[in-house]
Structures are given as C-alpha cells and as structure tokens.
Swiss-Prot record:
UniProt KW keywords: Chaperone, Chromosome, DNA-binding, Nucleus, Transcription, Transcription regulation
Stated name of the protein: Histone chaperone RTT106
GO molecular function, one term: DNA binding
Stretches with biased composition (Polar residues): 65-82
Tagged with keyword Flavoprotein: no
Subcellular location(s) per record: Nucleus; Chromosome
Gene Ontology cellular component terms for the protein in this record: chromosome; nucleus
Organism of origin: Pyricularia oryzae (strain 70-15 / ATCC MYA-4617 / FGSC 8958)
UniProt family annotation: Belongs to the RTT106 family.
Biased composition (Basic and acidic residues): 365-380, 407-418
UniProt function note: Histones H3 and H4 chaperone involved in the nucleosome formation and heterochromatin silencing. Required for the deposition of H3K56ac-carrying H3-H4 complex onto newly-replicated DNA. Plays a role in the transcriptional regulation of the cell-cycle dependent histone genes by creating a repressive structure at the core histone gene promoter.
C-alpha cells in the first residue's frame, strides 16, 4: 500500500493541522492515498507558480519558504524552509514544556508550549514534533506583552509574542501609500503567538524538560512561571545578536492608563483597555509605555510610539468618538488606522494622560521620534555585526557614533524643554504670589487625593507586577 506524502501535505496544510489529521484518518485505501498525494502536489505546484509570476515587490513566500518580519543583525533570511525550521526546532534539547496552554493565535486550540535554546514552539500530546506554522525563533521576537483578558469574571491573562514584521498595518502587503513590504525573518510562523493563562498555578505534572525542577519553584502561578522562564531566553537571544538591551515583557499598568468606564464584573479593578472597533471587528485598545496595541482578533495591530506620526479624532458624538492614528510604515510612507466607537468617557484619559504625555498629537515631534528610532536601530545593527564577527571594529565605531548622535538628540530635546520653562518664568507675574501659592496647595492636595484613591485599585495590579 502506497503511503501519504506527509512532507507535501504538511507544506500545503501547515496552517490547518485539523485538515491534515482528517486526511490521515481518511487515507484508508491506496486509491485515497494516491488522491490526497495528487491534490497536495497540484496545490503546491500552483502556489509556487503563482509566487513566481508575481512582481518581486509583491511576491509572498509560500509554504516552502514561509517567513515573516524584518531580519535582525545576523539572521539568515534565504534558503530556510518551514520544514527545515520545524526539524531544527525538534532536534534541540527541550528546556521547558508547559502543557495544556490555550492558544488563540495562530490557531485556537490547546497545545503544549515548548521552549528550547533557539525556539519557542507548540506541539500536541500526540506528536512530539512542533506543529507546522507554530515555530518562532527567539531572535525574531521583537515585542512581548502581558495583558489582562477583558470582560472575564475569572481573571485571565494573555501573552502576546510579536515577531518582526507581523504587527504593522503594511507588514504583509504593499502599502496603499507606497511602502515596501518588510523583509522576512527566519521563523516558520507567519503570525504572532497569543496564548491565555488563568490566574491559578499549574497543575501537578504540567511541566517537563531540562529545567522543569527549577521552573516548579517559580510556578506559584502561570504568570510567575512564564515571567521567570521567557526573559532568560530573550536575554540569551540578545546576547547572541550583540544587543545590550533584550526584549522585555511589557505589562499594562493602570498608572500609565486606566479606563474611566467602570467594569461591572470586577468593579473594584481598574480596566486598562478601551473597547474599539477596527472596521467591522470589535476589539480592545491597550495604551502601553511602548505603544498602542489592538487585539485580540486577527490581525493583531501594534503601533510603537516611535512610529506614530500623529493622533487625531473624528466623529466626536455625545457618547462615542473615533481615533485616527497615522503611522510611519517605512520608506517615507505613512498609513492611517481608524479605531471607532470609543466611549466618550475615555476621551480625557486617552487625550491628556497618553496622547499629550508622549506628544503624539504634534506632527513636528514625529520626526524626532523617527530620528531616535533610526539611530537606535543603527546602533543595534552595529552591535549585531560585531557579534557576528563581520567588520567588528567598524560596527563598534558606528555604534559609538550613533549612540553619540542619539545622546545629542536627547540633549537637544532637554534644551527645548528648558527653553519653554524659561519662557514661562519670564511671563510670571510676581504680583500673583499669594494666589499662586494658594492654588499650588490646592493642587497638591488634589494630587494626594488622587494617589490615595488609586491605591486600593492598584493592589490587584501590584500582584501582577510582582509576577513580573
């Protein structure tokens, strides 16, 4: 009896393991085996032909070279197929396995989450190999977030892992304003990773791998376990790339932003999200110290602060308003994203506590944010080149120069702020001393009341911060 061509079938249906399993179960006769093999060969041939016919600027790598993101310093971007990455990940020694984790993206299903030296991947209890399309290199992870799941009676948390090139609006397609697609990374997965954990501790027998014993000590809760394990692999990846600052797990913080809308299911807890639609899809906006994230439906969108050109508002009604964010998507092109139906109660918090805090409403500040980002990226590239042994001395010199430029930009910004303060002092009227002092006292008392009133609500959040 002939056998299924599992390699071709895996390439064609890498994002649909349910279909692949169904084919394996249905292949109970030579005729069906041949039929499935012929279908896989035909589809793969068509996909490859379609990719070859497309212009280079619009070509999307399919199956045999399914990649995503922007390459980091010394990552290889060519000649690495998805099957090669899966095989490479499967061959590495398993450091830690966390069983029965609820994954939502790329696929909604329970998987075992596996951590090795170079990879994080998902697999099932029935198959020791990684699931095709669910393998990520640590070096390709650019952002990690730890966020509460909105509107749940029982507290749950989402972890979001964003590889390079998977979170900007023009990541996978040609931008309508002329931006080029971002360069591919070396991960087999073309999507972010999103999984959900409960507030409870892992059940006995949920951990396996080389460091399972050490991990058990940190497993007071799922969040404390993940926050103990993941940063170690991110730091190691940063070291391999020659970067001084590893990727951090960024958590939501009610002191950074808290919604004014009261949560009916957990009234004593401040909400750190705002309901918002993107097109016809409903979701939630999180205003974080590194940028604005919209989730948790595909496609996830993250807008880093240093890529935001401006923020404006439209359709301001009695109960709702829309927020428009203009984003730098590369090569001098920008794209506008509109988030609609935000609650009017949150306008003040968004506009004053976040947008004005980071000067996101001021287009003139966007160039400075962009310059700082590019200087920092160039410095990182210099460090990565030195780590790879390629033009090490030149890369180090470039890194020093770029860091000098970055410090210069920061000093110029500090001088600008100082000049504004000096202008305020020149406009100061000595005759209003009494009133000013009185107003200052009142303001301080109000600030004190605000801090005190927030302590009770921050207790729950502090527990989450301890986990970090």
């Amino acid at each position: 009896m002939s056998q299924l061509d599992t390699e071709k079938l895996g390439l064609v249906f890498q994002s649909r393991p349910d279909i692949l399993n169904g084919i394996k179960e249905a292949a109970d006769s030579p005729a069906r085996v041949d039929l499935f093999n012929n279908i896989a060969a035909f589809v793969l041939e068509q996909l490859t032909a379609d990719a070859a016919d497309q212009p280079v600027s619009k070509r999307r790598r399919v199956d045999v070279d399914q990649t995503n993101g922007t390459p980091n310093g010394n990552a290889k971007t060519e000649g690495t197929s998805s099957t090669d990455v899966v095989a490479e990940a499967a061959a590495e020694e398993l450091q830690l396995e966390i069983k029965d984790i609820s994954v939502s993206i790329p696929q909604r299903k329970k998987y075992n989450l596996c951590l090795t030296k170079h990879f994080i991947f998902a697999r099932t209890n029935a198959d020791p190999k990684p699931v095709a399309g669910m393998v990520w290199r640590w070096e390709d992870i650019e952002h990690v977030f730890f966020l509460p799941v909105p509107e749940k009676t029982q507290q749950q948390f989402n972890y979001v892992f964003l590889p390079r090139g998977t979170y900007l609006p023009a990541s996978n397609n040609q931008s309508t304003t002329g931006a080029k697609p971002q360069q591919p990374s070396t991960s087999a997965a073309a999507e972010p990773l999103l999984f959900t954990i409960p507030q409870a501790a892992p059940k006995p027998g949920s951990l396996a791998g080389k460091v399972a014993a050490q991990a058990q000590v940190a497993a007071d809760s799922y969040s404390s376990l993940v926050n103990w394990a993941v940063p170690q692999f991110l730091r190691a990846a940063a070291t391999r790339l020659g970067l001084s600052s590893p990727v951090e797990i960024v958590a939501s913080d009610p002191k950074q932003f808290a919604s004014a809308v009261r949560q009916s299911h957990r009234p004593s807890e401040k909400a750190v999200h705002v309901k918002a639609f993107r097109g016809s899809k409903d979701g939630y906006l999180f205003f974080l110290r590194t940028g604005i994230l919209w989730g948790f439906k595909k496609p996830l969108v993250f807008l880093p602060l240093d890529r935001i050109v401006s923020v404006s508002y439209t359709s301001v009604l009695q109960r709702t308003f829309n927020m428009v964010v203009e984003v730098d998507v590369g090569d001098g092109a920008t794209e506008e994203l509109e988030f609609s139906m935000l609650d009017q109660e949150d306008y003040g918090g968004i506009n004053q506590d976040y947008v004005h805090k980071y000067n996101l409403q001021d287009r003139s500040m966007a160039e400075q944010r962009k310059a700082k980002r590019e200087l920092a990226e160039n410095a990182k590239k210099g460090g990565a080149g030195a780590a790879a042994g390629e033009d090490g001395e030149n890369a180090a010199d470039d890194g020093d120069t770029n860091m000098g430029e970055l410090q210069k930009a920061e000093m110029e910004e500090e001088q600008r702020l100082q000049d504004e303060e000096d202008e305020d002092e020149e406009d100061y009227d000595p005759g209003s001393d009494g009133d000013s002092e009185g107003e200052g006292t009142s303001s301080e008392e109000e600030d004190g009341d605000g801090d005190g009133g927030g302590d009770d609500d921050d207790d729950d959040d502090d527990e989450g911060e301890d986990d970090l």
